[in-house]
Amino acid sequence: TIYLGSLLAGLGCGSFYGSAYSLTSQNIPQAKKSFATAIVNSGSAVGSGLGMILSSYLVAQKGLPWQVMMYISAFMIICMLVAFQVIIRNHKEDMALIQPTVVDEKDNGAVKEKVPFKKLFAPHMLFAYILYFGTCYAYYMIVTWLPNFLSTERGFQGAAIGLSSSLVAFASIPGALFFSRLADKYMHKKVQFIVVLEFLATAMLLLTVQVSNATLLLIALIMYGFLGKLAVEPIIISWLGENAPKIGIGTTLGVFNFFGMMSSVIAPALTGKISDTTGSKVMGFYIAVVILLIGTILFMLVNLKKRGADSSNK
């Protein structure tokens, strides 16, 4: 039953972001899309942080049944379903804008559906997918295994586990809003923002596993949240929208999300296997660091090469 519930929860989570990004793309100007994506992602950060704190306090410290967290989650989901139904709806102006597009797509469906494989997996696109895989791999490994890592290998207990783990989520909110605003302001610098943030996040992730001092560990977690996935993801998505093939943008985003979701399956399972085999999750952290570092370097190199080619053509 719990596996079926997890499957249904995953389907819901996977379907939400595509719809949310579609709404923002329809209603938000190009110059503010990174910031809009950051706001959408901030909801995930708030939910993750509150979930970690409440579960540690109510279940681990107060001894309540774990099902209590499921009931709380179900209640909040129902509230948001009502809010979406009442507040977020298709207005007449939206439908007037959408209908001609739908008709045009029907008339030209054969052209719009086919994306050349060569363009879909061009080097700069492929390395963007790999970068996103590495970014999500590190994040989902942290989200899944950090509470257990803090408890079994760093001596944290009770509510301190959830509070410490939630620092990653809460620190990501100001990071996402701050860096997305900068990226929207300096739109031609998005690659530089992405590369610098990824390198810094990699360094913080490495520091997290290497330090034994609790204060330094918490600082590293806060900085990883501030600089990591939720901060850089809006900028990557904005960059992708500018560089993806204009024909079949939906297919491109689908491939991009596939790489990210694939990491959410591999990272928890692989780290768990490493923990069972070695008795420690440290190697799982190092693997995340290496994958993220490789993805960032590949993305940086292909964009440097692309920039050089564009300059020579001019």
Over which residues does each language-model region extend?
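Extracytoplasmic gate region of multi-pass secondary transporters
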Residues: P123-A176, I237
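C-terminal transmembrane helical hairpin of 12-TM major facilitator-type secondary transporters
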Residues: K189-W239
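Helix-loop-helix hairpin linking two adjacent transmembrane segments in secondary transporters
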Residues: V40-H91
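Juxtamembrane intracellular "pre-TM" segments in multi-pass secondary transporters
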Residues: D94-F127
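Glycine-rich segments within core transmembrane alpha-helices of 12-TM secondary carriers
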Residues: F35-I53, N257-A267
